[in-house]
C-alpha cells in the first residue's frame, strides 16, 4: 500500500482571516513536497485549481520543479483538468518533468473538473463538458501510446494532428495515466474499458460505499480484456497529529473556511461542526486523527476497495504550514509502517 498526500495549494491567512499571497501558497506547497520526499512518503499529487484560496493552477510546472528537488517520491497531477487544457501541452509538461526526475516518478491523473472554474477562465462552454473530456482523454492516450515522437489524431474539439512531433517522450516511453472520478459509475466503467487505473476522490459520506464502483471498474476491465495495470487509488481529506484531539482541532478551522467558501459558490448550507466530527470518525470520509487511528481506518477501507494507494489532503482553508509538515512526517514515519504491518497480518 502506497501512502501519500495531495494538495490544490493553500493560500495562507492573516490573523484577521484575509488571504496572504498566493505566491506564498505555491512556495509552501513546493516545500511540502520536498519535505514529504525526505520523510519517505510514496506519492504527492498536485490538483489543478484556479482560485485565490487554491492557487495550484500549473501542476506541470510544480511537478517539474519538485522533480529536480526530490529523489524518491512519485509525483503526479491530481488531477489535470484536460477538458479545458490542451492534452498536447499537458503531456509535454509532464514528460519534461519525467525527464528531469530521471524517469519513472511522474504520473498524469486526467480529470474533467468537478470544480468548473476553468470553463469560463479558458473560454469553454459547460454544455460541451462530456464531449471535451471524451475527446481530449482519447488524444492524451493516443499521444502516450505512440511508439515514436510523431502523432496523428483528429477530433472536433481541437485542430487535427497530422504526423506532428510531440516532444519530449517520457524516459520509459509512456507515462502512467490515471482516470480521476468523484464516484460516477460511468467514469468507473470508462476507466475499466480503457484499461486505465482509477483514482477516487472521496470528500464525504462513507468511503466503503464506493465498493460497488470498484467492482464495476474491475468487471469492466476484465470484460475489455485488461488484466494488468488495473489499480485503484483513494484520495480523501485527512490530517495526522500526535493525538486525535489535536488533529480534530487543527483541521476544523480550514474545513470550516473551505465549506463557507464552497457554500457561497454552490448554495450549500452553513458548515456544521457536528457533521465535521461525524465525518472525522469511522466510517466517515475524513482521515483526521493520530497515526493509529488513521492507519486502522485506511486498512479497514482496503478490505472493501482493495486500493493500492491512499493519499490525504490536509492543507485547506488556511491550515498553518507547520501543521501540514508535521502531518506529512507522521504519515511517512508512523502511518505508513503501521499500514504495512496491519496488511501483512491480515
Regions found by a protein language model. Give the residues of each.
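N-terminal beta1-alpha1-beta2 module of alpha/beta enzyme domains
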Residues: 1-70, 74, 175
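Flexible, glycine-rich active-site loops centered on histidine and acidic residues
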Residues: 2-22, 84-152, 197-199, 206
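Glycine-rich, proline-tolerant flexible connector loops at the mouths of alpha/beta enzymes
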Residues: 43-63, 81, 204-205, 313-323
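Active-site mouth loops of central-metabolism enzymes
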Residues: 12-26, 80-88, 173-183, 282-291
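An alpha-helical appendage that flanks or caps ligand/catalytic pockets
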Residues: 5, 128-166, 208-308, 340-346
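Conserved, mostly hydrophobic/aromatic
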Residues: 3, 40, 48, 66, ...
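Acidic (Asp/Glu)-rich catalytic clusters
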Residues: 37-38, 63-72, 94, 98-105, ...
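Hydrophobic faces of well-ordered beta-strands that scaffold small-molecule active sites
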Residues: 3-5, 44-46, 75-77, 106-110, ...
Amino acid at each position: 500500500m502506497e501512502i501519500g498526500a495531495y494538495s490544490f495549494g493553500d493560500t495562507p491567512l492573516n490573523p484577521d482571516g484575509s488571504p496572504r499571497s498566493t505566491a506564498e501558497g505555491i512556495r509552501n506547497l513546493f516545500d511540502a513536497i520536498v519535505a514529504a520526499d525526505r520523510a519517505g512518503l510514496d506519492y504527492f499529487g498536485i490538483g489543478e485549481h484556479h482560485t485565490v484560496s487554491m492557487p495550484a493552477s500549473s501542476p506541470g510546472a510544480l511537478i517539474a520543479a519538485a522533480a529536480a528537488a526530490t529523489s524518491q517520491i512519485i509525483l503526479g497531477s491530481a488531477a489535470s483538468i484536460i477538458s479545458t487544457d490542451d492534452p498536447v501541452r499537458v503531456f509535454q509538461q509532464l514528460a519534461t518533468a519525467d525527464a528531469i526526475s530521471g524517469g519513472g516518478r511522474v504520473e498524469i491523473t486526467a480529470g474533467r473538473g468537478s470544480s468548473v472554474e476553468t470553463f469560463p477562465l479558458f473560454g469553454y462552454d459547460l454544455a460541451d463538458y462530456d464531449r471535451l473530456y471524451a475527446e481530449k482523454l482519447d488524444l492524451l492516450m493516443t499521444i502516450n501510446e505512440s511508439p515514436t515522437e510523431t502523432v496523428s489524431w483528429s477530433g472536433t474539439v481541437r485542430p487535427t494532428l497530422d504526423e506532428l512531433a510531440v516532444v519530449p517522450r517520457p524516459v520509459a516511453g509512456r507515462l502512467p495515466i490515471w482516470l480521476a472520478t468523484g464516484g460516477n459509475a460511468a467514469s468507473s466503467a470508462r476507466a475499466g474499458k480503457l484499461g486505465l487505473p482509477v483514482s477516487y476522490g472521496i470528500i464525504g459520506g462513507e468511503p466503503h460505499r464506493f465498493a460497488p464502483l470498484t467492482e464495476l471498474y474491475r468487471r469492466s476491465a476484465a470484460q475489455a480484456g485488461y488484466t494488468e495495470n488495473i489499480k485503484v487509488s483513494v484520495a480523501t481529506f485527512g490530517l495526522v497529529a500526535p493525538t486525535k484531539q489535536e488533529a480534530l482541532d487543527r483541521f476544523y478551522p480550514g474545513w470550516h473556511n473551505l465549506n463557507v467558501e464552497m457554500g457561497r459558490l454552490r448554495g450549500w448550507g452553513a458548515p456544521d461542526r457536528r457533521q465535521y466530527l461525524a465525518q472525522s470518525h469511522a466510517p466517515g470520509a475524513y482521515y483526521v486523527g493520530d497515526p493509529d487511528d488513521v492507519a486502522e481506518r485506511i486498512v479497514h477501507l482496503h478490505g472493501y476497495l482493495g486500493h493500492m494507494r491512499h493519499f490525504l489532503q490536509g492543507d485547506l482553508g488556511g491550515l498553518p504550514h507547520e501543521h501540514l509538515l508535521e502531518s506529512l512526517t507522521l504519515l511517512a514515519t508512523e502511518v505508513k509502517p503501521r499500514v504495512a504491518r496491519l496488511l501483512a497480518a491480515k
